[in-house]
Each structure stands twice: as C-alpha cells, then as structure tokens.
Amino acid sequence: MVQRNILITGSNRGIGLELTKQFLTKGDQVFALCRKSSSDLVLIKPTRILEGVDVLDSNSIRDVSTKLLGTKIDILINNAGILIPDNLQSLEEENVFTQFLVNALGPLKMVKAFLPSLNTNAKLVFLTSRMGSVGDNNSGAYYGYRASKAALNAIAVSLALDLSPKGISVGIFHPGMVATQMTGGQGIPTIESARGLIERIESLNLNNSGKFFHQNGEELPW
C-alpha cells in the first residue's frame, strides 16, 4: 500500500487520537494537529505534531498551512469539535455561536487553507453527528449542537459538488455514540468507532462523495 499523508485535527485525544494511532499502524504518515499536545499523542509518535492549531483562530490555521507547504495531503480529517448541551431553559446565544464557529466554520476554513496542498484524488473527511439530521431528530434539545452539525453537513455537501471536478471526494461521517470526554465516557470504545470510520474513509470515492454515513456503513437521512 502506498504511504499517504494524512492530516487530523483534534488529534490529542478521543477519536482523533485513535484515528492517528490506527493510520500510523497502517503505515501512513500522520500530521497531528491540536491546540495542545498530550502524553498519549506523544507516545504513539505521529509523523509530526503541530500544536497551537485552534479552528476558531484563522491565523493559527494559516500558520499551520504555511508550515506544511510542500507536503501533499491525501486525506484531511476534520475531527475537532465541541458540544455544549442545552435546552430551552439553559440556551445561551454565545454557546450557540461558539458551536457554529468550531463545528461548521472551522472545518470550512481548514479546507480553504489546505486546498492548494491537496493531492490529486484527495479525500476530505468531516466527522459530523446524526444529531445534525433533521429527519432523525426524535429527542429534541441540543439546539446549538444540532444546528452547527446541520450547517456542517450542508457545507460538506456543497464542497462535494464544488470539488468533484478536481477529483476530490468528501466524506460526511457520524462516528457513533463514542465514549469520549465530549460524551462523558458513555458509548462505544474509540477503537471501534475509529475502525469503522477508517473503513468508510477507505471506501470513499466520487460515487459516494457527499453522502451521510454512520461509521457502521448505514446511510443516514438528512
């Protein structure tokens, strides 16, 4: 298998860390982007750790894209995200805006910054959530998070359409309910989620670009 250059945001813990680990095991080069590294990330020895990358900060995104000039990226995985639980009583405008900036605008800024570095037939991966599905909403609440992930889904579909002439495919993947800091440790193990996500990434092509999949292979409604 040809060694690939893979960029992963939010790689210092949770799903991002496990994806980094599993891609390294496959023999790929992984560039681990994060706000602050972790002992777990250092332990698995990514190709390169790039700290200080905050998707809220356009300058930090621009700086890291400059540092990696000349490196052709085969897979860009937008994993960094935030969840702030809310309901009608606890809803705060600032929290809604923050989730939009991190979960929707952040990944779009990453794509814009790294577009010149994407290899021929590169893959863009967006870790979204089925909570961003309108048709699958059966429980309500989580207004800011749901809206931000729905916005991310819309952005990713537009990117799939805009970038298909360049041979770039776009994956929109729900990782499942995963036991991470974001979910309070509830859900499936990160190793299981990452394994399924990698299967979806490996099978991603222009024919299924822009579709919404669960990591287990189920196609999800918008």
Predicted regions and their residues:
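Conserved glycine-rich Rossmann-like NAD(P)H-binding loop of the short-chain dehydrogenase/reductase
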Residues: K26-L41
